[in-house]
């Protein structure tokens, strides 16, 4: 059974983090909210109790997801133990995903070199490596990136597909197709 760690740092973007957790859990994918602390507060003052406190080891997970938000993304970027785990996942061929401003952590880890990625408008100016593409969701090998709060559902459905879940049933059941059409 696949297992996903959604990393929560103080100042994370609630829509991006909780949408991913909700959709993955609806798909019956094991998904833990892993925080730098037991309780974290999002960028819009929503407090969340994490499932697990980050101890520097995420090796029992198959995917790490980095939500955006500020200063949450900066906290992710600046945590050396997390950067080492991202690099380890990349070496092992495990999946990594980041949305909004969180690709700055992938950049800090040196994982965007020769990769296509997307992010929140303007954040690409902080990223020296990689090739920015203004798309809703970008997949390049084991890396998946997305733009921001309004793309969180599309991002989450892509992750479900990558992890072997039935994203189409979720899209239908959550009325995503009714609202956004068949091309999304």
Locate predicted features.
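Extended, subdomain-level signal for the structured scaffold at the beginning of enzyme domains
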Residues: 1-92, 96, 105-108, 113-114, ...
């Amino acid at each position: 059974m696949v297992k996903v760690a959604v990393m929560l740092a103080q100042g994370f973007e609630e829509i991006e983090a909780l949408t991913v957790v909700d959709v993955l859990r609806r798909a019956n994918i094991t998904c833990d909210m892993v925080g730098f602390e037991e309780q974290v507060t999002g960028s819009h003052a929503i407090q969340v109790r994490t499932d697990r406190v980050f101890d520097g080891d995420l090796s029992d997970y198959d995917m790490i997801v980095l939500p955006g938000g500020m200063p949450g993304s900066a906290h992710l970027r600046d945590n050396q133990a997390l950067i080492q785990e991202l690099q380890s996942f990349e070496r092992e061929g495990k999946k990594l995903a980041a949305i909004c401003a969180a690709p700055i952590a992938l950049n800090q880890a040196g994982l965007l070199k020769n990769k296509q990625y997307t992010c929140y408008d303007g954040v690409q100016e902080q990223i020296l490596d990689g090739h920015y593409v203004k798309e809703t969701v970008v997949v390049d090998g084991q890396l998946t990136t997305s733009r921001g709060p309004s793309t969180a559902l599309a991002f989450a459905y892509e992750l479900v597909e990558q992890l072997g879940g039935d994203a189409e049933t979720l899209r239908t059941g959550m009325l995503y197709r009714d609202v956004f059409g068949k091309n999304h």
